[in-house]
Amino acid sequence: MKALYPDIITTVGIIFLIILELFLPSFDLIGFLGFLISFISGVLAIKYSLAGYRFNEWLLDINAFSLLLKGVMYILTSFVIFSSVSFFKSKKTFVENVYTFLLISLGLSIMVSSKNLAVILAGLELASISMYISVGMLRDDYISKEASFKYLVLGSMTTAFFGIGSAFYIGATSHLDIISVSVNHNTAFALASLFLFVAFALKVSAAPFHFWTPDAYEGAPTSNTAFISTVPKIGFYAVLFLLASYIFPVTNNFSYIVGIVGVISMFWGNLVAYAQNSAKRMLAYSSIGHAGYFLIGFSRYNPLSVSSTIFYVIVYAFATAGAFLVLSILEKNQSWTHDMSNYRALYKRSPFLATALALFLFALIGIPPFATFVGKLGIFLGLVNSNAWFFAILFVIGSIIAAGYYLKLIVYMFFKEPATKDNMSLSLNLFDTIGISAFLIIVFFFGIFPNILFDIILKDMFHG
């Protein structure tokens, strides 16, 4: 029963914050309590994961692996809330932003708590609806509202694909439990696999299902982009792991479809990123490229490949959230835009922010000593061990191509002269510094000591 405590605490906390906000609509108070609720839930989830707790009743199947993912999502949520409160206040966004983040995390937590398609859909819808709202949280901002509507329209296709896939799944198996797959390779089951995969490919921004991503990421408040581009990805890839574990192996050659979509996404995201003049849109296409890396990792179901992919997803989430949060700090200065020209000589105006953003970009490239390097190396070795040389070679080529557009922004920050002589001062408070430093420490720490996290993932995924 203790395995349910993190979700119970979050649920009660959300209800409390909704009531409290009616009487005390203070960003500082609601933000602090939101941070506390999410952080406590995350710590408890990781504690129970390490203790091997399990709950397997009422269509739920909470084990050590799902508890680990819950813990990571809740802690990452708490970090983003902590780092975003000053941005919320500067942009006069809605106080509801805080518990919208908690609602998304709760939906994702429900989603990874079950191997039943009905429960997964319930969690998916709670998270998705809250994400649509989160994108449109900027007051009196047409672009934000337009981005939210586009995300709603295209994101709703996920529900349609998921529902169709579930219908075919019931027709093929007569139940909704993913773990009870024992059917022949019939057409209905193959279609179920295809539609379920497309549903989550759309959610993780994999090409050619990525069209909502650039507009949603650019139109959302930047701190909200930091959240929706990272925390949900952990939950969605966890479900893709379940599909890769139980459904895809039963369908002949389906792993090749996953791998090919991954290759398309990797090259499309990384190549189109070069054409972007906005740092925010560039990072949006970076997420599309990374979706390709992750899908290629899942395309070969072996312990090293899939555990490396989950490890990579987790550390990528911290690196990407950190990068977007640096952008949100810059955006608090009212005249700031994310055009590349504004990043010229950023190092002279704010050495800390320029250095932090450069380190996050190096982490996204995937070079040592950052934790993302370990994830990429593990995926590559997993592909080699599976004799998937075609995907392994393309994986390396895609990673090399991606380095260029990250380095382009770094060159602008450190080696380009400003476009104007206007030496705009950039504000930076203590909470900004602490928040960004926390993300940097995590990305560095698990790069130097990867086994601490990697061994837990490997053990929980295949023995939890």
From Swiss-Prot:
Disulfide bonds: none annotated. It is found in: Cell inner membrane. GO terms for biological process: ATP synthesis coupled electron transport. It is a multi-pass membrane protein. GO terms for cellular component: plasma membrane. It holds the Pfam family Proton_antipo_M. Its main location: membrane. Its EC number is 7.1.1.-. It is an enzyme of class 7 (translocase). It comes from the Bacteria. The chain crosses the membrane at residues 12-32, 33-53, 62-82, 93-113, 117-137, 152-172, 189-209, 227-247, 254-274, 282-304, 310-330, 351-371, 400-420, 434-454. It catalyses: a quinone + NADH + 5 H(+)(in) = a quinol + NAD(+) + 4 H(+)(out). One of its GO terms (molecular function) is quinone binding. Keywords: Cell inner membrane, Cell membrane, Membrane, NAD, Quinone, Translocase, Transmembrane, Transmembrane helix, Transport, Ubiquinone. NDH-1 shuttles electrons from NADH, via FMN and iron-sulfur (Fe-S) centers, to quinones in the respiratory chain. The immediate electron acceptor for the enzyme in this species is believed to be ubiquinone. Couples the redox reaction to proton translocation (for every two electrons transferred, four hydrogen ions are translocated across the cytoplasmic membrane), and thus conserves the redox energy in a proton gradient. Belongs to the complex I subunit 2 family. NDH-1 is composed of 14 different subunits. Subunits NuoA, H, J, K, L, M, N constitute the membrane sector of the complex. This is NADH-quinone oxidoreductase subunit N 2. It comes from Hydrogenobaculum sp. (strain Y04AAS1). The gene is nuoN2.
